[in-house]
Amino acid sequence: MKSTLIIFFTLCLSMAVMARHESYYGNTKPAKLNEEKVTRVRFYLHDTLSGQNPTAVRIAHANLTGGSASPVGFGSLFVIDDPLTVGPEKHSKEIGNGQGMYVSGCKDLSKFTIVMYADLAFTAGKFNGSSISIFSRNPVAEEVGEREIAIVGGRGKFRMARGFVKVKTNKIDMKTGDAVLRYDATVYHY
């Protein structure tokens, strides 16, 4: 009888422990966040499609747009590893890189728009090891003033970031698609 009780309690305890560990979530607790901060950062993104060492490469292209005169024809998907610099000059101090993808999302070049996801990572200076993530529609043809793209996250010093980036085309070569863009980021973070 004694051994039967021991086995019974062992089985009950095992089942209770197993039931506890089958849950895929933990307890929900109220979050205590630090005070929210706002940081403004200006840098330049160099997007190069041409030459021996491009930083943006087409990885997919729809057959129906094969005859497009644009270097970034409708339906083209690009992967990027663009340098971020302090100034607009090609040899300006590099402070990071933007890695991600963009797709040409507009048939009409006069309304040229890309949809992009990128992680803008800082590799030097005060924000070394931190990044901001953008995921947004970028209406490139709307050059009156500045375009605005959304900041949807971040890491490091920009953990839980949100905000926006004002984008202004500093220089563009319409034949090659090469561009230098000024990014003025307003980042809300904790």
UniProtKB/Swiss-Prot annotation:
GO biological process annotation, one example: phenylpropanoid biosynthetic process
Tagged with keyword Plastid: no
Residues spanning the signal sequence: 1-19
Top-level taxon in the UniProt lineage: Eukaryota
One GO CC term, this protein: apoplast
Gene3D superfamilies: Allene oxide cyclase-like
Record: glycosylation sites: 63, 128
Major localisation: secreted
Localisation per UniProt entry: Secreted, Extracellular space, Apoplast
UniProt keywords, alphabetically: Apoplast, Glycoprotein, Secreted, Signal
Function (record text): Dirigent proteins impart stereoselectivity on the phenoxy radical-coupling reaction, yielding optically active lignans from two molecules of coniferyl alcohol in the biosynthesis of lignans, flavonolignans, and alkaloids and thus plays a central role in plant secondary metabolism.
Family indicated by similarity: Belongs to the plant dirigent protein family.
PANTHER family named among the record's database cross-references: NUCLEOPORIN-RELATED
Quaternary organization: Homodimer.
Record's protein name: Dirigent protein 15
Native organism: Arabidopsis thaliana
